[in-house]
Curated annotation (Swiss-Prot):
This protein is able to complement bacterial recA mutations, but its native function in the plant is not known. One of its GO terms (molecular function) is nucleotide binding. LRR repeats lie at residues 136-158, 160-183, 184-205, 208-230, 232-254, 256-277, 280-302, 304-326, 328-350. One of its GO terms (cellular component) is chloroplast. It comes from the Eukaryota. Keywords: DNA damage, DNA repair, Leucine-rich repeat, Repeat, Signal. Pfam families: LRR_1 (PF00560), LRR_8 (PF13855), LRRNT_2 (PF08263). Disulfide bonds: none annotated. This is DNA damage-repair/toleration protein DRT100. It comes from Arabidopsis thaliana. GO terms for biological process: DNA repair. The gene is DRT100. InterPro entries: DNA_repair-toleration, Leu-rich_rpt, LRR_dom_sf, LRR_N_plant-typ. Residues 1-26 form the signal peptide.
Amino acid sequence: MRKLLASPFSSLLAVVFISVISVVRCCSPKDQTALNAFKSSLSEPNLGIFNTWSENTDCCKEWYGISCDPDSGRVTDISLRGESEDAIFQKAGRSGYMSGSIDPAVCDLTALTSLVLADWKGITGEIPPCITSLASLRILDLAGNKITGEIPAEIGKLSKLAVLNLAENQMSGEIPASLTSLIELKHLELTENGITGVIPADFGSLKMLSRVLLGRNELTGSIPESISGMERLADLDLSKNHIEGPIPEWMGNMKVLSLLNLDCNSLTGPIPGSLLSNSGLDVANLSRNALEGTIPDVFGSKTYLVSLDLSHNSLSGRIPDSLSSAKFVGHLDISHNKLCGRIPTGFPFDHLEATSFSDNQCLCGGPLTTSC
């Protein structure tokens, strides 16, 4: 019988196959221990998302919401959302509810790049201060819970952080001074908390920020001038705070600003003409302040406003004629001011209801019942 000899090519394949097998890593035992401690501080009774987190399975391969580095076996991502299109939510036909707190053991996951534990409605306690030791962290999203306490004072140590979302919690205290060291930050959302104090004067050093959502807090002081240098800023929401002073003229020079919400503050003075002539601005809500003067007559063929709300101020004078030359105005509310004169006819006024003009000093004409 002829003896079968392995060819050089088949031997090479065997070496490659063995090499590939050798680099497939299982979950780091240290990380698995940290995840078990993390799980033990949380309770999710409805969906059973922790059912896959078994001692007998590999956390990198079978644990819901966990991702690992394929080479090192270190845990890199925890992604657990209480509202999701994932099959586990669709099958249950409901959003999730989770209670408990964030165990400091999560800080032992030193390769973590993303920590998402959002929209569970019932997670309480404070953010562990040691979270600032996770040097690789790029995403921290804990929105939609009942987390208390302050933003960790040393948050600025997270030099790679790109997303910080702590919205819709019960947090207090001021914006830490170190936060302005997060030079990679692109998205900051602290909406609907109890954050106090002023916006840091050097806030504009966050040059990469495109979204700043700080509405529904207790912020005071004025809008820092340093924000004028944030050339990537597209969305700025400071609504429902206690911001005072004038709307800065430089806001009209922010080329990519598309959403500006300053509703329900204590802003005074006139509306800068440069702001309303900014052709990139899509949504502007300046309502419920103490703004005075006339509505700037600066609209034109490049004006494209999805929504313009100037209601509940002390604006006087006439509705500017140039508004009729705007390319598009979807929603307009100038009610509850001191405006006078005839409401222009034609676009965009022909599709607006009386509520857009009500409670002014002496406006007249359609759609109001007051004739001129």
